[in-house]
């Protein structure tokens, strides 16, 4: 494994302007399938990081698949911070990435926090992306871009969960600006383009917006078909949820969208769908990351 030593970096304030310069953090990881003393398994062939972005040593609860925990900056993200994450899964590699807790975006004094997440999966590779929720505090200003680039028969499953305000404290996202994009392409052909843009209270309660729900989530899985779509709908019906939820099929991508008020309920709704599709498309039972149980 090639590791680039991190350069010291921290939040700074300009003496001349008093403005917050923020964290500027980067992380690049490449996953490859390699022969080890215990057979073939996915390893971190490359890992370079700068600033307060880290990963823990991979866990192997299912032998060949690497479970990796991505550690975000301590104390959350504020205006002026910049996070750049780039992860590549090579052919035959299979990685599952998650985070130990929610990522918090705090109130900004005027500057915007920028987050770029580029996930590349080469032909024959598999990547699963299951971070915990993003919590946008009232007054946060965030621009987030998540891009999934697939090649050939690459597989991808993942979700993104967004919470605007802090509903557990009855805090409404009454001010701030969120512009979050989620895009999937295969061989440079765009397949799915999602955008969550909130810069005024009306976006939260509009019928075409969040309908007064503080949380929204999207789950996607490649390699799907009409039969799996119907099975996924049956999974949802069995749970008898009162949360607005919809499933669609775009090419071979199953897309699930959910509105809700509690993250654990949203995750509980999506997990059976993940379990169904993982077994059907990857021929592997879903293994819950251990960190979720702590």
UniProtKB/Swiss-Prot annotation:
Organism: Alcanivorax borkumensis (strain ATCC 700651 / DSM 11573 / NCIMB 13689 / SK2)
Keyword Cytoplasm (UniProt): yes
Keyword flag Ribonucleoprotein: no
InterPro entries per record: UreD
Its job: Required for maturation of urease via the functional incorporation of the urease nickel metallocenter.
Gene: ureD
Family: Belongs to the UreD family.
Keywords: Chaperone, Cytoplasm, Nickel insertion
Oligomeric and partner information: UreD, UreF and UreG form a complex that acts as a GTP-hydrolysis-dependent molecular chaperone, activating the urease apoprotein by helping to assemble the nickel containing metallocenter of UreC. The UreE protein probably delivers the nickel.
Region (Disordered): 1-22
GO CC terms of this entry: cytoplasm
Pfam families reported for this sequence: UreD (PF01774)
UniProt-recorded Gene Ontology molecular function terms: nickel cation binding
Coiled-coil annotated residue ranges, if any: none
Name of protein: Urease accessory protein UreD
Subcellular location: Cytoplasm
